[in-house]
From Swiss-Prot:
The protein's name: Translation initiation factor 6
Lineage top rank: taxon: Archaea
NCBIfam families according to UniProt: eIF-6
Swiss-Prot/TrEMBL keywords: Initiation factor, Protein biosynthesis
UniProt record, GO biological process: cytosolic ribosome assembly
Disulfide bonds: none
Family the UniProt entry places it in: Belongs to the eIF-6 family.
Species in which this protein is naturally found: Cenarchaeum symbiosum (strain A)
One Gene Ontology term of the molecular function aspect: translation initiation factor activity
Amino acid sequence: MDIFKYDVYRGPNIGIYTSANDEKIFLPRGFAKAKAARLEGYLGAEALYTSVANTRLMGTLMVLNNSGIIMPSTISEIEYEFYKKHTDLNVVVLDTKFTALGNMISVNDRGGVVSPVFPREEVRIIADALGIEVIQRRIAGYNQVGAMMVATSGGGIIHPETDGEDVKRISEVMGVHMEPATINGGIPFVSSGLLANKKSVVAGSFTSGPEIMMLTRAFAG
């Protein structure tokens, strides 16, 4: 598994503005073509330029795996049609009061963790849309579980203060070992600084050498 360091909009928070699965990288409109080409090379996926709810917060607002995409109810009809047309994914708009879905939900192709604040019916919709088993659980005392972890089919990292039993249970659900780690020089909210798929991991530009070593171990599978 290759690990790369990269920045977006002159900052290390690549996971806020981008999102990816094994086939597509979703980037904000106006994103520099040269930078997009490098991400395509790193991740072996096609870049698509779009928006969510007329913002560039791709990672914060959307949730996806290789089966589907969950979008907030604030997405526009034009945006919805774009995702339907340019992907072969199951595109589902979640009718919920929460909009920052990427901060509240974390998934891979095997499982997912959903914030306890979602009602049971919405959790069922999420699981069915993405074709996975999900559990509801706080991580390190936070309801914003999507901000606390990142997992692919090859591994994952999670907030370093996560309880050992929670790490074990989440690893079981995701089908990969979850490694407690930080990103971007000590940031525990790991999804803000990470973009990953089965081929590679792209970390924020402030990520330290020891953190790179942890990422290498975490995503070795």
